[in-house]
Amino acid sequence: MLKIDKDTHRIEGVEFYDSCNRDERPFDAVIDTIIVHCISLPLGEYNNDNIIDLFLNKLDISKHKSFSDLSNLRVSSHLLIKRKGDIVQFVPFNLRAWHAGQSCYNDRENFNDFSIGIELEGTSDSKFTKEQYSSLNEVVVALKSLYANIVNENILGHSDISPGRKQDPGDLFDWSKVK
């Protein structure tokens, strides 16, 4: 069972890379939402350090032609769940990661302010692994135990809060496997 340190707002025992692509949440922000994303760099290629490098502003854009659009991008997520279920944390949960971008859902905007962003290594048109679902569920349980305002109805896809702009986690993401 995962445990989140209440002082550091980090999951104990997981790999942590300190992304500078973050800032303070608004003073009155209440964490009550989880946003599920997916990412792979390059598209459909897994088990490399490109996502980590992107979130740390260290991505070598000469490594792949598709990286040229990412040269000045400053983004992060609180977590990345790799294909084998390994969890990597980039931003403590009490801080605002830069994952949602322009967002609106149910008359709420600026989802970075009150949400936790979780990236699954994958694409919006591929299936995710049982290990990823297992780790995601462990994370959800741990987050709910620390942030009482997170409820199942507030576990959303990036496509829910940015329709027309984002497709992730995609139609093959099995929401019935998320507790």
Question: What are the residue ranges of the model-derived segments?
Answer:
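N-terminal catalytic cores of peptidoglycan-degrading enzymes
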Residues: 1-109
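Basic/polar, cationic surfaces and motifs that engage anionic cell-wall
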Residues: 1-12, 28, 109-114, 123-179
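Conserved, mostly hydrophobic/aromatic
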Residues: 36, 118, 136
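Residues immediately flanking
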Residues: 38-39, 120, 159
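Hydrophobic transmembrane alpha-helix bundles
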Residues: 49, 112-117
